[in-house]
Amino acid sequence: MVIFGDPKKVQMKIRSLSVFILLLLMLSGCKEPEGLEIYATTDLHGMLLPFDNTEGTATDHSLANLASLVKTVGSDNMVLLDNGDILQGDPLTYYYNFEDTTREHIVPDILNHLHYDAATEGNHDIETGHAVYDRVRRECSFPLLAANAVDIQTGKPYFEPYTVIRKKGLKIIVFGLITPSVPNWLPESLYHGIRFEEMVATARKWMPVMQKENPDVIVGLFHSGIGNEDEKGDDENSSLAVALNVPGFDVIFCGHDHNKDIREVVNNAGEKVLLLDGGSRAEVLMHANIPLRTKREVSGNGEITGSLIEMNTLPPSQAFIEKYSDVTETIREYTSEIIGRSNATVTTRDAFFGPSGFVDLIHCIQLDISGADISFAAPLSFDEEIKEGDLRIRDMFRLYRFENFLYTVKMTGAEVDRFLEHSYGLWFSTMKNRNDWLLRYRFNDSGEPVMVNGRLRLRSASYNFDSAMGIRYTVDVSRPEGSRVTIMSMSDGTPFFPDSTYSVAVNSYRANGGGGHFAAAGITHSMLPSRVISATDRDLRYYMTEWIRKKGEITPVPLSEWSVVPEHWVT
């Protein structure tokens, strides 16, 4: 079954009939189906080997599963692509990014071994910094793509705009784009010398160039979500905007938004375009079958078809696992290192309803490192836990998922208030009585809350739910958005003044405009650099690790001084 049209169907059944046939052929040793198979991974976030190095447990989905498919089909009979965000998200890649920089990086090592043909850069790849992604680029035996990441000095793409691949008698062009929103999240130091241009205009610029190559197929490899029809190409997720408004693409592989989706659309020239979106962390493999063509004329084999393959339906390659067994053991040893001890178990779940030991530990570390007056921090995961007992390196990836830097910025008291109003507007509903929802969930057209994997789905990402430490305040959820927060004083009891200036500790994502908090506070993106007092040289997780090493023993408890009112509605 090939799924088109209704994206909801992909949640019910994402394995296609063609995949079922392919698996039968793998078992029987028969020849693979006619046509060219294109496979694409996206948003792997370090899930290269069958082991979750943060949880310390084996997993049934990784590139070990893909390795068995490559061996069966053969690299000459397939095009293999990656759609970015591979360099961040697991201790495995962190180790090779920053701890062991002398050996070949694990990402090009594995992708070269699997005969990848091309990859597009993602925003989390850029977040590792020039030293890392430039090194990875040098070590890859295939091109890294991003036509809209432009070298400021030359005016040409910093990475390759596209690549030409010839397989099974077909000439395939793969064109890469990265989400243009990178500057909204990352400090300029991480992409110095690069500007990010909007996607539709960039695709229009390069389409005539690519068509002069007389390809049989043009494939988009976009590290950007599908998005909406009304987006213009400068939005975070603009793949659909390109598909609809830039004729010439046959297939577009999407990513970044971690959604699973397949849909066929008709562009403004009346041509069909297939879009696939492939989730994250090697859960699924995007797949398109290209019928044999000559000069872009479809043969009698039919139209391009697509599917999402559940990665764990492919058997893992034992040869692949054995090849990288030393790497697996190295990372196990690295993540098992004891750095201290916690005298309490803490969870992010508490943080959604008031002060929590988990988030307040982040607050305390940020305030201690920065010396700031106030700290802003959020629960980066919905349901994360650090248990009482020995603290290991892997626990630091639970405490802080992202490789953000720590910034100290200047804000007035009024701006602090508006910042918090925005945060709690993302976070809490306006309640009329104690039976109303406190948290802002997503609701369907029938007014029922949306459930995903048995869990209510929040309207906004929890990493945007910033609370504050260093001040005493309440959040009145009976009042409308924008007028809920009342700041009584600083934590030491001294007055808090709207017109006074305070030093505030925030992560680099927030300090560069992520989440819209600073914009809501009245601080535009262009104003942000002038507000920066200082920034760390390394990621915040590194400093948290060293802070705990120095302390040796910690007792994380709720320490921030804020509460939700009316109390009898929320208790």
Language-model features: locations:
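Bacterial N-terminal signal peptides that target proteins for export
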Residues: K9-S18
